[in-house]
């Protein structure tokens, strides 16, 4: 396998499996926060304290109630992450290869002296590099595609978590939606979801990549001793492990970048999330994004657009940071094994 074909990225299977694993893990660990966010957003009168009191008084008790809806959440987040990361990597690879205007600038190498700054091209990632515009577009397109595919599971998850519906099983919930609303019911709120998720994902990838770059420069890894000129040049070009950080340093930078990016993007996109939740829970009362927004603002004021922000911000910060860190580390390991042994022997 040529270096060019190796640099095109790991097999899509690796990205799918890595995305699936990271998504399922984050969904299970953070399900209580997601459930509380849904309860707070389901009406303008709910507060976190009221939601917790309601869960404590339920027949199941507080702890089991906090993990209600874990299965649809894990399925949605797991397969959503798998589809998203696979699609994102495919878009970034093809954009880097075929669209020079979206590709990241190549690293500058002091060819005359053969010397580069020790930390100039260190990276915490093995993923394709794009320009700011490329990252913004790639993230938005990949998230919109994954969101459409997983929309039925999203509707089931939100309704299962809500106290408005007394579903006892996913199959029963699906039958009820199909009977009362038809196929359209499984895509309730997709417009608000797409408008929320596409900008969120695009901005997230943009901020995430820029944050990794800045943190890598702020906290450089000590240079390896006695590197030859050839090794140094290869490291700068990203052609071997010389341009990669240690596992712990890379994971720390990726996690911190994920938290920062999620907080910023959650604040920007929360109004769309609040509207989307109302549409999915009460489709007869909130028919579409424009009507729902007007009704919420007229009846409850601007504050209704920020319902659940603290919970959503907490969950997004942790879930995004965890998912991206686990995903990137699995891909780094796969890339390393690919380089050493060849693709046919690689196991995540």
Curated annotation (Swiss-Prot):
Subcellular location: Mitochondrion inner membrane
UniProt Solcar repeat ranges: 10-94, 130-214, 249-333
Gene Ontology molecular function: glycine transmembrane transporter activity
Keywords noted in UniProt: Membrane, Mitochondrion, Mitochondrion inner membrane, Repeat, Transmembrane, Transmembrane helix, Transport
Membrane-spanning ranges: 16-41, 69-95, 136-161, 189-212, 253-279, 308-326
Database matches in Gene3D superfamilies: Mitochondrial carrier domain
UniProt-listed PROSITE patterns: SOLCAR
GO cellular component: mitochondrial inner membrane; mitochondrion
Membrane topology: Multi-pass membrane protein
InterPro entries referenced in this protein's UniProt entry, alphabetically: Hem25/SLC25A38 (IPR030847), Mitochondrial_sb/sol_carrier (IPR018108), Mt_carrier_dom_sf (IPR023395)
Catalytic activity: glycine(in) = glycine(out)
Domain of life: Eukaryota
GO biological process entries: glycine import into mitochondrion; heme biosynthetic process
Family membership noted in the UniProt record: Belongs to the mitochondrial carrier (TC 2.A.29) family. SLC25A38 subfamily.
Summary of the function given for this chain in its UniProt record: Mitochondrial glycine transporter that imports glycine into the mitochondrial matrix. Plays an important role in providing glycine for the first enzymatic step in heme biosynthesis, the condensation of glycine with succinyl-CoA to produce 5-aminolevulinate (ALA) in the mitochondrial matrix.
Name of the protein in its database record: Mitochondrial glycine transporter
Gene that encodes it: mic-13
């Amino acid at each position: 396998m040529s270096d060019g074909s190796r640099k095109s990225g790991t097999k899509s299977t690796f990205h799918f499996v890595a995305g699936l694993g990271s998504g399922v893990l984050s969904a299970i660990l953070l399900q209580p926060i997601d459930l509380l966010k849904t309860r707070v957003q389901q009406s303008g009168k709910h507060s976190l304290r009221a939601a917790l009191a309601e869960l404590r008084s339920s027949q199941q008790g507080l702890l089991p109630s906090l993990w209600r809806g874990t299965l649809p959440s894990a399925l949605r987040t797991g397969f959503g992450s798998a589809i998203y990361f696979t699609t994102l990597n495919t878009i970034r690879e093809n954009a880097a290869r075929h669209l020079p205007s979206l590709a990241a600038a190549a690293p500058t190498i002091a060819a005359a002296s053969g010397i580069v700054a020790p930390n100039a091209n260190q990276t915490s990632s093995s993923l394709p590099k794009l320009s700011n515009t490329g990252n913004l577009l790639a993230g938005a397109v990949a998230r919109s595609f994954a969101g459409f595919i997983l929309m039925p599971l999203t509707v089931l998850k939100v309704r299962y978590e809500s106290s408005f519906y007394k579903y006892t099983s996913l199959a029963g919930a699906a039958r009820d939606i199909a009977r009362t609303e038809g196929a359209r019911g499984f895509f309730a709120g997709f417009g608000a979801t797409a408008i929320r998720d596409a900008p969120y994902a695009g901005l997230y990838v943009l901020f995430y990549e820029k944050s990794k770059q800045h943190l890598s420069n702020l906290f450089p890894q000590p240079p390896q001793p006695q590197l030859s000129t050839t090794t140094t040049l290869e490291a700068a070009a990203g052609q071997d492990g010389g341009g990669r950080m240690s596992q712990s340093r890379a994971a720390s930078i990726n996690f911190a970048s994920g938290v920062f990016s999620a907080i910023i993007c959650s604040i920007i996109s929360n109004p769309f999330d609040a509207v989307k939740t109302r549409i999915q829970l009460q489709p007869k009362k909130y028919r579409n994004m424009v009507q729902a927004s007007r009704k919420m603002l007229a009846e409850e004021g601007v504050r209704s657009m920020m319902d659940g922000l603290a919970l959503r911000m907490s969950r997004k910060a942790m879930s995004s940071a965890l998912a991206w860190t686990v995903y990137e580390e699995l891909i780094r390991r796969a890339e390393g094994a690919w380089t050493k042994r060849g693709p046919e022997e690689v196991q995540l």
